[in-house]
């Protein structure tokens, strides 16, 4: 937890308007997570923009006012406010996966026709 807090502090040294946080709470205890969440909220209150990358659904649901859902490295949806639910995120991923699988199957059958 201390290493993440030091990295956050170092990132703020140049007073950026935008801060990218990639999995800032991965592998740390609950107390340290709470401290980092509090710190992130303070930054937002100061007008900073945080790009928060996380694979932990509860973090996204609890911390974000906008979520970009990615699947296989591509943005597949943008959710705001009350749209940000676990069900919606999972539905968007499943819908995209099915669509891509169907398109892949269609292109393979077209190749077989030739």
Model-derived regions: residue spans:
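Glycine-rich phosphate-binding loops of nucleotide-dependent enzymes
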Residues: 1-114
